[in-house]
């Protein structure tokens, strides 16, 4: 049976979080509610999750030796990656030595790289995906695009939040897309995936949680992206029963293959009753921020329970709900947010400000949340709230 000790004592249950953005911050808050001792690690100081953890370390998490040193110093019971850009080979070694990585080190390694997870889904599991090719050079990228046809997508195999992604409408776009992908990759210049276009009706995130009692699914989350970056999400996304059943089949297959415990954000394309696998994150998903108001147990509460081996007997969806991001553009280390009385004036609205220490360019700094009697009404309410936030740099 699971047991949780006293934080900052010899009996403490220690979790080391790798990556301290807004998703990690909400997870730490849920872990704190269970009395877990949390150590937060990221490449910069005062990251959001560090502000609610017991202590923190600043290091380059792609540096395997530095990551190993802090893990051996802290001796956590669980290592929980919150981002892709981690020395996953070191996590594999540490897992072999007896550490527990959530959900598994293999899951972190495969999903850090679009090639690993795409080959698992399409070639090993036989799941429907968009047609694709990988390319290491501009010439290979051009050949792949010409073979797949236009429009098509070019993405770095290692990136997140839409960085380095572009849509090619013709062969005239290939050179610029290649350079953009090289600039946007997490590990610098390198391999890209070229994907054929799928004419889908909508895309969803199916939040899938593997826990002590089995596998559970949240209601599907619909979302709107711009340049690969989430702008809005809503729950529940209406789906044909056959499409929802197929989405669950695909999500179950890929999460079973990855194994371990925790929440997974399974991204899927849907057209009518057809469903295609797109990507998977073995951790809370940014589009799942809507669950802060749409469910009795948010994706972060579900992840915390799953990690700790606690039961998840039911997930209650509370009705139409939506999220809309608060974007800040400019240069500042002292951003302030005003007009909050108007932001929160409507019933059933909420606001989360992430507390990020600065902005350089464009950055997601908060999210507005809303519930209403329909998805459209909830979306409009969330968008109004987000737009009402007054930014001062």
Swiss-Prot record:
SUPFAM superfamilies: Glutathione synthetase ATP-binding domain-like, PreATP-grasp domain
Binding site for N(1)-(5-phospho-beta-D-ribosyl)glycinamide: 22-23, 82, 286, 356, 363-364
Reactions this protein catalyses: N(1)-(5-phospho-beta-D-ribosyl)glycinamide + formate + ATP = N(2)-formyl-N(1)-(5-phospho-beta-D-ribosyl)glycinamide + ADP + phosphate + H(+)
GO cellular component, one term: cytosol
Keyword Ligase: yes
EC number of this enzyme: 6.3.1.21
Amino acids binding Mg(2+): 267, 279
Entry keyword set: ATP-binding, Ligase, Magnesium, Metal-binding, Nucleotide-binding, Purine biosynthesis
Pathway: Purine metabolism; IMP biosynthesis via de novo pathway; N(2)-formyl-N(1)-(5-phospho-D-ribosyl)glycinamide from N(1)-(5-phospho-D-ribosyl)glycinamide (formate route): step 1/1
UniProt binding sites for ATP: 114, 155, 160-165, 195-198, 203
Signal peptide bounds: none
InterPro entries, per database record: ATP-grasp (IPR011761), ATP-grasp_carboxylate-amine (IPR003135), ATP_grasp_subdomain_1 (IPR013815), PreATP-grasp_dom_sf (IPR016185), PurT (IPR005862), PurT/PurK_preATP-grasp (IPR054350), PurT_C (IPR048740)
Pfam families in the cross-refs: ATP-grasp, PurT_C, RS_preATP-grasp-like
GO terms under biological process: 'de novo' IMP biosynthetic process
All copies of domain ATP-grasp, residue ranges: 119-308
Domain of life: Bacteria
One MF annotation (Gene Ontology) recorded for this entry: phosphoribosylglycinamide formyltransferase activity
Family of this protein: Belongs to the PurK/PurT family.
Role played: Involved in the de novo purine biosynthesis. Catalyzes the transfer of formate to 5-phospho-ribosyl-glycinamide (GAR), producing 5-phospho-ribosyl-N-formylglycinamide (FGAR). Formate is provided by PurU via hydrolysis of 10-formyl-tetrahydrofolate.
HAMAP family from the UniProt entry: PurT
Subunit structure: Homodimer.
Protein name: Formate-dependent phosphoribosylglycinamide formyltransferase
Species of provenance: Stutzerimonas stutzeri (strain A1501)
């Amino acid at each position: 049976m699971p047991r949780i000790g006293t934080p900052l004592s010899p009996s403490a249950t220690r979790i080391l979080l790798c990556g301290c953005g807004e998703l990690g911050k909400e997870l730490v808050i849920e872990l704190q509610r269970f009395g877990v001792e949390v150590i937060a690690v990221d490449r910069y100081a005062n990251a959001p999750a560090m502000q609610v953890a017991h202590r923190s370390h600043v290091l380059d998490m792609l540096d395997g030796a530095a990551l190993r040193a802090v893990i051996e110093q802290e001796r956590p019971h669980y290592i929980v990656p919150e981002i892709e850009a981690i020395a996953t080979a070191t996590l594999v070694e540490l897992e072999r030595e007896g550490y527990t990585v959530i959900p598994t080190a293999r899951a972190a390694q495969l999903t850090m790289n679009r090639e690993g997870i795409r080959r698992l889904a399409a070639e090993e599991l036989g799941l429907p995906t968009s047609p694709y090719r990988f390319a290491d050079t501009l010439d290979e990228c051009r050949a792949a695009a010409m073979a797949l046809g236009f429009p098509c997508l070019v993405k770095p195999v290692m990136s997140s939040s839409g960085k380095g992604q572009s849509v090619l409408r013709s062969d005239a776009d290939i050179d610029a897309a290649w350079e953009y992908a090289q600039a946007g990759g997490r590990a610098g210049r390198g391999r890209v995936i070229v994907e054929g276009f799928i004419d889908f009706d909508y895309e969803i995130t199916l939040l899938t949680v593997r826990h002590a009692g089995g596998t559970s699914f949240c209601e599907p989350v619909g979302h709107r992206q711009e340049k690969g970056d989430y702008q809005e999400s809503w729950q529940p996304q209406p789906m044909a029963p056959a499409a929802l059943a197929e989405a669950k089949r695909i999500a179950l297959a890929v999460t079973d293959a990855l194994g371990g415990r925790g929440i997974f954000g399974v991204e899927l394309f849907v057209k009518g009753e057809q469903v295609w696998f797109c990507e998977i994150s073995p951790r809370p998903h940014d589009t799942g921020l809507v669950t802060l108001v749409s469910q009795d147990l948010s994706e972060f509460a579900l992840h915390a329970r799953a990690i700790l081996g606690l039961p998840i007997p039911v997930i209650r969806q509370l009705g139409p709900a939506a999220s809309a991001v608060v974007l800040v553009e400019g240069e500042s280390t002292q951003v302030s947010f005003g007009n909050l009385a108007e932001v929160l004036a409507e019933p059933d609205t909420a606001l989360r400000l992430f507390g990020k220490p600065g902005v350089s360019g464009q950055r997601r700094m908060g999210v507005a949340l809303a519930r209403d009697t329909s998805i459209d009404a909830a979306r409009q309410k969330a968008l109004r709230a987000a737009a009402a936030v007054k930014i001062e740099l």
